[in-house]
């Protein structure tokens, strides 16, 4: 039941190979690179990483700049957490992805055969579809997907190390998310056109079966359509052909996440949990 508490409980996406995080993957698998470098200009540092083929799903917060201006800092903090919790729910439907990182305005999911996926691109599409079909609070994330070679590794200094993933697919997925035309559609997924190959939309996004009280199981009509390839100027990569899959049916949320975040801050203040310590 929704409510307010001062405790915190977290959960992690589980995969068939128990790689809940990139760190889990790196410490449990043979490294592609494991060396110490003594550079005459920057000094000594270690390089540890694994190269792999993967599909990146980038889901960015729509209107992040506007929200940051119109919401108070506390409201924005709550909005971001609501978005991330909702996103983690979507990633739970596919147990073959790893949450690469939470950014200030986006979440990156990583799919790979190394994590148990038979078709990483298809699995990423299924998670993206879930977002579009279950956007009850009108997050409308900007979604981009791209595949290719990435390097997962440790970065940092002797005081603190973190893990991350690097490579062209991350930039391409983020760019696809920002370059989708959206228009008057409920949600849109954008990706390089050549990744679609000869797939059929009806095979990829199969009809959802609903339980009708009188007619029993009934298949829902297809609400997604795929557009023709379109060329765009992609910074640093030249002309690229992209494709979009759009959900044409708008849901009717009873309340938006933007409104809900304001309500939560009001409740926090009314309960005396908002304490400024200047």
Identify the meaning behind each predicted range.
Residues 88-89, 130-134, 175-178:
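Substrate-engagement module of ASCE P-loop NTPases
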Residues 125, 167-173:
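Amphipathic alpha-helical transducer elements in NTP-driven molecular machines
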Residues 123-131:
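Short amphipathic alpha-helices in soluble, non-transmembrane regions
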Residues 1-42, 181-278:
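Intrinsically disordered, glycine/charged-rich C-terminal tails and inter-domain linkers
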Residues 158, 172, 179-183:
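Conserved, well-folded catalytic cores of nucleic-acid-processing
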Residues 35, 39-123:
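Catalytic NTP-binding/metal-coordinating core of nucleotidyl cyclase/transferase enzymes
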Residues 91-119, 135-168:
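Catalytic core of nucleotidyl cyclases, primarily class III adenylyl/guanylyl cyclases
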Residues 62, 149-150, 194:
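Alpha-helix/helix-capping structural signal
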């Amino acid at each position: 039941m929704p409510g307010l508490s001062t405790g915190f409980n977290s959960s992690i996406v589980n995969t068939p190979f128990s790689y809940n995080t990139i760190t889990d993957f790196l410490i449990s698998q043979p490294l592609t690179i494991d060396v110490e470098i003594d550079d005459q200009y920057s000094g000594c540092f270690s390089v540890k990483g694994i190269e792999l083929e993967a599909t990146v799903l980038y889901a960015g917060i729509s209107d992040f700049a506007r929200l940051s201006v119109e919401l108070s800092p506390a409201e924005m903090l709550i909005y971001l957490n609501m978005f991330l919790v909702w996103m983690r729910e979507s990633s739970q439907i596919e147990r073959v992805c790893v949450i690469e990182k939470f950014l200030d305005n986006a979440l990156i999911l990583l799919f790979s055969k190394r994590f148990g996926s038979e078709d990483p691109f298809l699995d990423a599409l299924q998670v993206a579809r879930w977002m579009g079909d279950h956007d009850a609070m009108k997050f409308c994330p900007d979604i981009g997907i791209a595949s290719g070679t990435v390097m997962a590794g440790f970065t940092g200094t002797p005081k603190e190390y973190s893990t991350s993933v690097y490579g062209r697919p991350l930039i391409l997925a983020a760019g696809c998310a920002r370059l989708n035309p959206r228009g008057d559609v409920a949600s849109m997924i954008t990706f390089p056109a050549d990744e679609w190959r000869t797939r059929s939309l009806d095979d990829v996004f199969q009809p959802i079966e609903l339980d009708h009280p009188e007619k029993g199981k009934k298949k829902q009509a297809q609400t997604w359509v795929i557009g023709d390839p379109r060329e765009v100027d992609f910074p640093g990569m030249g002309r690229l052909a992209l494709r979009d899959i759009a959900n044409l049916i708008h849901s009717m949320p009873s309340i938006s996440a933007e409104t809900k975040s304001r309500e939560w801050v009001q409740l926090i203040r009314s309960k005396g949990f908002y304490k400024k310590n200047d």
